Amino acid sequence: SSDLRDVVDPTRTRGRRAWLAAQMWALLALLMIPLESADSAGLTFEQATVDLPTYITSTPSVTAWLVVAVLGLVVALLAPLATHLGGLVMATLVTVLAALPIPVTGAISVGLNHDFATDSGALAAIGMTIAAACVLVEVLDGPDPAVTCRVSWQERVGAIITLAGGIVVTWQGQAGHSWLSDRWGVARVVLVIASTVWVVLSWLPRSRVRGWLRLGMVTIVLTVLGASSQLVPPRYLIGQTPAVNYLGYELPPAPTTGVLLAPGRPNIGFWTLSILGIAGYLFAVSIIKHRGEKWSGARIGSWIGAWVVVIYLASVGLWEYSSMQFSWHMLVHMTFNM
């Protein structure tokens, strides 16, 4: 089949929608730069605007909005000008990438276990972006069986990741307090409930009414995420050591060989990447075999074996200690490369 864009979008209808949405996205992100600067520095909007260059790099959260605005402008250029499907795929990847800067620079990067929360928040943001896009496609185009068949499983996986990531972030932020003991916790409970309803709806038969219900859940999730970013979780108010601030956990005692090779502190990000890498490869192989083509079992075994090594390294004590000693860090790094 042709990879020309005209085959699937001859009138550029989808491109115009994306172009308008990306422009709004970029403009709102630019507006957030002085607003976030003022909020972070305790200034008025006018004070932050007059001396904006000083505050753009004052905190990671302000710089994050600048990155989001730039990525929005990139999508605004790609959406109408791309002539091949590859350009649209690139715009999609940039859109997903733009979901990361804000979540990973918020309160989830503070305090004990923030390594778990940061990874979970980033994965939840990616899952939510993909799943929300699937919902939007169905609402705009209607419950077309051909479209539904292509995007339904993506929405389900994305919604599940959104829910799981949201639970981990809430657990870390509440720091052992009741989830209903403060405003941030209540907001996060609403988020978890909306995500749960979204997951359930994604598995039900498609209809226009259920499509709008799923879009309603997406709206609630996005609204609560935006509102909760302005609230302070209990974890944020707890003092932390330099080690916790940097690593997310206290420095463990001097290791032995057994400790380095035994199960340690897992890395959620690499675990997820490994599982998706294996699942995606097996899915691609199943498509190839469905077409009647052959695929070497040795290739499959090599691919899975490599990801199993990554899972092992991201789960043992060596990974935990590699964050604090350069020699062990390079050992993990070079093993990954090989």
Which positions does each model-derived feature cover?
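Polytopic transmembrane helical bundles with strong interfacial aromatic enrichment
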Residues: 2-256
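Early transmembrane hairpin module of multi-pass membrane proteins
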Residues: 18, 27-40, 51-69, 246-338
